[in-house]
């Protein structure tokens, strides 16, 4: 739904959709369905093994498209599974780049991580956990009355925003997202991840009037 909503707001539409059975890596049918539409981008919603299988197979069949994964996939796991086939695969993230210490929050995260264990590698999951921990601590400081679940949630929903290392988090009843920011990363040839700091315009294929094509696999 999120992909469709984002596309509609930009006068774009899906041109194909492929599916695979959960917990399997049989993605051939999805690939052949999608390949016929000649998409410029494939938005992938799934676990890292089937997504990696799809990308490798797509490259074998010379599908010239940008492969975009959401953070659920697990960036490091996907990069490792893909190997050299992972070059230029894009992954969205819900937290800033964990190695960008120019961001105050990330710098504070590095200091906390190092103080706990200098041998632990920074990562997206632990940074997200650090942010949640900071949020809970700040919420408890603001909480009035007994520290019950109800009072804690009420504090989070009504006393925001929460400023954590230069980044603001806001919550409300029915809105537990905290941040509306989306951070993009791209897999490098050596399997490492790099932050995407700016986007260049793509040459799109017009379908009808101002509509452009994209596709979704899930």
Where are these regions (language model features)?
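Extracellular/periplasmic catalytic domains that process cell-envelope and extracellular macromolecules
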Residues: 35-36, 60-62, 81-85, 147-150, ...
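Short hydrophobic alpha-helix segments
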Residues: 17-18, 197-199
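Extracellular/periplasmic Venus flytrap/periplasmic-binding protein
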Residues: 1-62, 98-107, 111
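Segments of small-molecule ligand-sensing domains
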Residues: 113-126, 137-196
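Short beta->alpha junction loops/turns
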Residues: 20-23, 47-48, 71, 129, ...
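A structural signal for well-ordered alpha-helical segments within the folded catalytic domains
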Residues: 52, 130-134, 178
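Extracellular/periplasmic periplasmic-binding protein-like sensory domains
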Residues: 55-130, 193, 199-203, 207-218
């Amino acid at each position: 739904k999120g992909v469709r909503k984002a596309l509609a707001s930009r006068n774009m539409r899906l041109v194909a959709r492929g599916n695979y059975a959960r917990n399997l890596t049989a993605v051939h049918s999805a690939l052949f369905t999608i390949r016929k539409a000649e998409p410029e981008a494939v938005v992938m919603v799934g676990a890292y093994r089937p997504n990696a299988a799809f990308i490798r197979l797509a490259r074998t069949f010379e599908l010239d498209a940008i492969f975009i994964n959401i953070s659920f996939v697990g960036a490091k796991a996907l990069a490792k599974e893909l190997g050299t086939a992972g070059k230029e695969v894009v992954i969205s993230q819900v937290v800033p780049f964990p190695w960008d210490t120019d961001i105050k929050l990330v710098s504070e995260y590095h200091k906390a991580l190092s103080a706990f264990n200098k041998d632990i590698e920074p990562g997206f999951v632990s940074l997200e956990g650090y942010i949640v921990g900071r949020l809970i601590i700040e919420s408890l400081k603001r909480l009035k009355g007994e520290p019950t679940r109800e009072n804690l949630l009420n504090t989070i929903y009504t006393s925001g925003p929460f400023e954590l290392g230069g980044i603001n988090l806001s919550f409300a009843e029915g809105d537990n997202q905290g941040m509306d920011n989306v951070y993009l990363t791209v897999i490098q040839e050596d399997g490492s991840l790099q932050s995407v700091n700016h986007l260049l315009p793509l040459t799109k294929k017009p379908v009808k009037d101002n509509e452009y094509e994209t596709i979704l696999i899930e």
